[in-house]
Amino acid sequence: MSGSFLDRDVPPTLISFAIAPLLEGELLTTDLKAVGHGVYLFAGKTPEQQAAAWERFTALARAGKVVSAWAVENGLAEAVMKMSFGNEIGFAAENTVLDWFAPMPGAIVAELSDEVSDAVRIGITTAEKAIALGADSASIEELAALNDAVLEAVYPTKTRDSGTVESFSHETKARVAPAVKQARPKALIPVFPGTNCEYDTQRALSEAGADAEQFIVRNLTSADVADSVERFAAAVRTAQMIVIPGGFSGGDEPDGSAKLITAFFRNAAVREHVTALLEQRDGLMLGICNGFQALIKLGLVPYGRIMDTDESFPTLTYNVIGRHQSKLVRTRVCSTRSPWLAGTEVGDIYTVPISHGEGRFLASRELIEQLAANGQIATQYAGLDGYATMDTAFNPNGSVCAIEGITSPDGRVFGKMGHSERIGPALYRNVPGTYDMHLFASAVRYFKK
């Protein structure tokens, strides 16, 4: 790799990547799981001893005796401390001879469900929410706060906004239905330069029973763009739904996200056939993350049609925290008016991955009240109590009224920030929650009923 940027030169560099695939049943998480378990060190002073320790650890893991593990970098103290954070299970050291603060690259600390004799036992998990190393002890809460504070000034994790806001609920079950049924509805997935969620989106739609097709938008030359417009307009004529996936279309430039997508959909031919899909053929549209940004800029949410926007329209802007956020959040269903949410109930809580720098929903109070009354506020970010919140730990972008997703007036166009397509077996095993809100299955059923 080499190159330059302005006055900065990058010397020729070799970068190596390595992966170690394993069966999903062998996957371990780092959080301590239960009180009364022995905690062991698998390490060696020579390469041969280290390899033997790894083999012994692997054998125990495959036998189901390892319930959590940590690859040591900066010492045993760091390992047991961070292992304790997830479930606030304490640790008491039993081996004080070890150097708890010396780097130990290659070593593994593991929580075992059974006793073993061929590894070094270093301690035991405890009910007390503290880490005890001999006579020294500190609470997990204190240690976690100190750990978070190290880079808080550089990479803040909190903002001043906190507390609850109104949790909207709209109980109507009235939904639109298509005049023509489809056993296997076709879903068109436009892929723009910078889109990066098309494969997850296609997989989710296909598994739900849709005929999901990616459409690559080419923009290398003006002729490529014209050809893409013509072919996309033709493809829309035979589609039942359009799903705009997430990513960073056009690198989120110039000056904001989704402008490339917006310009493409405002083309007269594309606009005509998208309008026909929605207004004449009862079709559906979904925009996730970057796709949601495009739907808002086009007016498709909350107004249900492509239109010229002005300063009174809602928008999605930069996260309050001032940086990109990537994490799992909880969302609360506020309305089931949309066919996309037919598999949910008002008040249901779903955990969803988010990854964006511009996800803060802003709208006037008057518009929000109108959307709430119409049942167009589909989902809100929620805290552990199940209610909407402005706390940055749960509302990652500072969206007004904690709004995560909204719909068109009839619910057939849905935009949301959370990546509901990024779910599947063996994912997020260390974060409890309900992940599948049946978004794509509900869309397919809409055309079958």
Predicted regions and their residues:
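Intein/HINT protein-splicing elements and their conserved insertion hotspots or analogous self-processing inserts
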Residues: S2-M104, S113-K186, G194, R203
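A generic local secondary-structure boundary/capping motif
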Residues: G3-D7, L27-D31, L98-D99, V176-A179, ...
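Active-site glycine-rich loop that binds ribose-phosphate moieties when present
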Residues: A52-W54, A269-V270, M307-N319, H324, ...
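Hydrophobic alpha-helical bundle architecture
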Residues: S68, E94-M104, E111-S113, L220, ...
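Conserved phosphate/anionic-ligand binding catalytic regions in large, soluble enzymes, centered on
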Residues: S68-K82, G194-E198, F248, S257, ...
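N-terminal beta1-alpha1 cap of cysteine-dependent amidohydrolase-like domains
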Residues: G134-I288, F292-Y303, D308, T317-Q325, ...
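C-terminal and late-domain segments of enzyme folds
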Residues: L328, V333-K449
